[in-house]
Amino acid sequence: MNVILLIPARYGSSRFPGKPLAPINGKPMIQHVYERASLAKGLTNIYVATDDERIKATVEGFGGKVVMTSPDAASGTDRINEAIKLLGLKDDDLVINVQGDQPLIDPTAIEQLINLFERQPGEFEMATLGYEIVNKADIDDPMQVKMVFDNNYYALYFSRSRIPFGRDTQDYPVFKHLGIYAYTSKFVQTFAALPLGRLEDLEKLEQLRALEHGHKIKIAISASNSLEVDRPEDIHKCEQRLAAS
């Protein structure tokens, strides 16, 4: 089984234009993501999928590989689907999708998803990771996506709101979605052909498209958190984390 890691990256973020090229300790964010992801064991290849020549030049400048996609992708997974076709991946190839705004991605989290597919081949088409929230302020932060799952660790829902809501207590675990996906190449193509979901559009969470159309998402719980850069002020948090590591 080939394992291809793809990092979708776009320049035109409404909250943070040029985010993939933002410097973190003197190195562009996309380079941090690429280099940390490449430390994961079991990868066949790794590419950045982008539609921007500036990002392409930066990635190639540090020795990374790039696949150029169109600017019309509706979501990161739609961009991944285009990259799959351009790279000529086989239906049973495993695709790992790491977001371009995760400069502190833990390589062992990537390995955890690969191992999940290797241990349970054919049992699911898509998987992702969660992390039990420690900082309670994150629970009500809409930029921190929360998730709930059933007893067999299949996703029930993802939301920017607090889920579940404890009517009589606030003392219960809440899980953050880490935003890293693994799926078969064939399923990515299936996903991209699905119409935009109503809940996906409301929450602006692409993974809800799969749930709305009856597809299961397997969940594994990670021991490590991942800091996503959503706003310029998150850069300082990343630099603090890197300094402490």
Swiss-Prot record:
EC number: 2.7.7.90
Metabolic or biological pathway, per its Swiss-Prot or TrEMBL entry: Bacterial outer membrane biogenesis; lipopolysaccharide biosynthesis
Keywords associated with the record: Cytoplasm, Lipopolysaccharide biosynthesis, Nucleotidyltransferase, Transferase
Xref: SUPFAM superfamilies: Nucleotide-diphospho-sugar transferases
Domain of life: Bacteria
Matching Pfam families: CTP_transf_3
GO MF term list: 3-deoxy-manno-octulosonate cytidylyltransferase activity
GO cellular component, one term: cytosol
CDD domains for the chain: CMP-KDO-Synthetase (cd02517)
GO biological process: lipopolysaccharide biosynthetic process
Compartments reported by the entry: Cytoplasm
Reactions accelerated catalytically: 8-amino-3,8-dideoxy-alpha-D-manno-octulosonate + CTP = CMP-8-amino-3,8-dideoxy-alpha-D-manno-oct-2-ulosonate + diphosphate
Biological role stated in the UniProt entry: Activates KDO8N (a required 8-carbon sugar) for incorporation into bacterial lipopolysaccharide in the Shewanella genus.
Family (UniProt): Belongs to the KdsB family.
Protein name: 8-amino-3,8-dideoxy-manno-octulosonate cytidylyltransferase
Species name: Shewanella putrefaciens (strain CN-32 / ATCC BAA-453)
Originating gene: kdsB
